[in-house]
Regions:
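Short acidic-hydrophobic catalytic motif
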Residues: 1-58, 65-68, 74-91, 95-121, ...
């Protein structure tokens, strides 16, 4: 009888150009390689592998070509505008431009690598209310509102979502099949996740918004 330690781990296939910085490792539970993305990152693959992230108030869009199995996941949070207001739904506002860039970068990479826009399906996750006493703004809901509006405006197909509430989520996405596994995390994880997202939020306040991305 073959034991788990006797199973040969296959060689890791090369990632697409531009994603060499993303950490990838063998996931024994799922029998495939998994790419782990952090706040502000995204990953696109043409291989049968998983993409993993942990979300608090940030959101992730999982997008794939349902015919060819090419897809990716992002992980982002919207910045406030310079006046501390909420420009999430204002065309041309900093938040809308930042969020749009986060979505368009990933979609563009999917299309560049063989995906077709007409085949795209979207699943969204995150937007939990885990950062308390930061300000009066519900950061998670703001992120949810943006990504829903973006999907509607761009006429993309939203097939499922698991958003809101007060807990963080671990998301494991398999672009080749569209399958997603969600694990709701306990409160003991909140402090670490909130600290990471607070640091990320602080960085994007001053970070220039990326340039326009032309969609195929």
């Amino acid at each position: 009888m073959q034991s788990a330690t006797d199973i040969r781990i296959p060689d890791m296939k090369p990632c697409l150009p531009g994603f060499e910085h993303v950490s990838r490792s063998w996931d024994r539970m799922h029998g495939c390689y998994a790419a782990k993305i952090l706040p502000g990152e995204y990953y696109v693959t043409i291989h049968d592998e998983a993409i993993v992230t942990v979300l608090g108030s940030c959101v992730s869009a999982c997008i794939r070509d349902k015919v060819f199995g090419i897809g990716g996941m992002n992980h982002f949070m919207l910045p406030e505008d310079s006046g501390g207001g909420d420009d999430v739904l204002v065309p041309g506002g900093k938040a809308a431009r930042y969020g749009g860039f986060a979505m368009e970068q990933m979609i563009n990479d999917i299309l560049k690598n063989g995906g077709l826009r007409k085949n795209l399906e979207v699943k969204i996750f995150g937007g939990g209310k885990i950062i308390r006493n930061m300000d009066t703004m519900d950061i998670g809901q703001r992120n949810i509102d943006f990504v829903r509006r973006y999907i509607e405006t761009e006429e993309l197909t939203l097939v499922s979502e698991d958003v809101g509430n007060v807990f963080p989520r671990k998301v494991i996405y398999f672009p080749a099949t569209g399958r997603v596994r969600i694990k709701k995390l306990r409160n003991m994880h909140n402090t670490t996740i909130a600290r990471r997202e607070t640091d990320y939020r602080r960085k994007i306040v001053e970070k220039p918004v990326g340039g326009d991305v032309e969609l195929f």
